[in-house]
Every structure is written in structure tokens, then in C-alpha cells.
Amino acid sequence: MALEKSLVRLLLLVLILLVLGWVQPSLGKESRAKKFQRQHMDSDSSPSSSSTYCNQMMRRRNMTQGRCKPVNTFVHEPLVDVQNVCFQEKVTCKNGQGNCYKSNSSMHITDCRLTNGSRYPNCAYRTSPKERHIIVACEGSPYVPVHFDASVEDST
């Protein structure tokens, strides 16, 4: 009887460990929508002409860990306005996919580009504040931005 109880407990423990092994890796994984927000949203500030803005933000948002991300764009608009782009003009993404959308109006953005000669771990960026239409890839339920594809000038 005691042997049976021990065996049942052991089997239960093994089963629990197996389930935790399958579930646990997905618990800490950042969703594509959250990654988009971390890498591209800066609603709390306006476009900065400060030459150090990109250096600070790229470090703060963990985009200089292990390598220097060559290009990144921050959007200075409310998140809901950027999410609404997913229901505006449908365009083809740079990679040929059909899930990109262009904003109806210009948005305040800051382009960050790695400066020539800049090498990890000393990533240095050029800061360029702009007003442009943004193009984002959207997916999921709810349908939200998951990739910043491009920014384009007003065509009028």
C-alpha cells in the first residue's frame, strides 16, 4: 500500500514537471505586439531634437544588447492612434506580405540610425525627428501592429 502511494506520487510529480516544462517557456516570452510597443512606441514624449535621444532610448529599450540594431523608429503618438492604422489604407509590406497598413495622416516620429564607424558595445545613433506617414504590419486578435515596416512622406 505504501509502495503504491509512493509510486502514484512519483508519477504525479513527473507529470507536473512535464507540464511545467511545456508551459513555462511561453510564460516569459514577449508577444510580437508587446515587442512592437517596446521597440517603437514613445507616446509620452514629443520628437526630440536632442542628439542623445536615440542613444538613450535604444539602450533603455534593450536594442543594444549583444549587437547594435542598425535602424529603429520611435512613434510619438497615442498607442490607440497607432493601433488604428491597422484599419486604414492597406499596402504591400517590403517583404511582399499583404498585412501592412499606411496611416491616413502624418505622425510624429524619430528615426534612429547607427552612425558610421559605430561598433558594439559603443552603439552611437543619429537622431532625426520627422513628421511622416507610418506603415505597420498587423496581425492577431485583436488586430494590432507587430512590425514597423516604413515611414513615408506626405504625397500631397
Curated annotation (Swiss-Prot):
Active site: H40 (proton acceptor), H147 (proton donor)
Paired cysteines (S-S): C54-C112, C68-C123, C86-C138, C93-C100
Pfam short name (any one): RnaseA
Compartments in which it is found: Secreted
SUPFAM superfamilies, sorted: RNase A-like (SSF54076)
Chief subcellular location: secreted
InterPro entries documented for this protein: RNaseA (IPR001427), RNaseA-like_dom_sf (IPR036816), RNaseA_AS (IPR023411), RNaseA_domain (IPR023412)
Cleavable signal peptide: 1-28
Entry-listed glycosylation sites: N62, N104, N116
Binding-site residues, substrate: K35, R38, K69, P70, V71, N72, T73, K94, R113
Region listing for Disordered, in residue ranges: 33-53
Tissue: Pancreas and other tissues and body fluids (indicating it may have other physiological functions besides its role in digestion).
Biased composition (Basic and acidic residues): 33-43
EC numbers for this chain: 4.6.1.18
PTM (free text): N-linked glycans are of complex type.
Result after altering G117D: Substantially decreases binding affinity for RNH1 but maintains high conformational stability
One GO MF term: ribonuclease A activity
GO biological process, one term: defense response to Gram-positive bacterium
Effect of N95D: Substantially decreases binding affinity for RNH1 but maintains high conformational stability
Family annotation (Gene3D superfamilies): Ribonuclease A-like domain
One of the record's GO cellular component terms: extracellular exosome
Keywords, in A-Z order: Disulfide bond, Endonuclease, Glycoprotein, Hydrolase, Lyase, Nuclease, Secreted, Signal
Protein family: Belongs to the pancreatic ribonuclease family.
Quaternary state and interactors: Monomer. Interacts with and forms tight 1:1 complexes with RNH1. Dimerization of two such complexes may occur. Interaction with RNH1 inhibits this protein.
Purpose of the protein: Endonuclease that catalyzes the cleavage of RNA on the 3' side of pyrimidine nucleotides. Acts on single-stranded and double-stranded RNA.
Protein name: Ribonuclease pancreatic
Gene encoding the protein: RNASE1
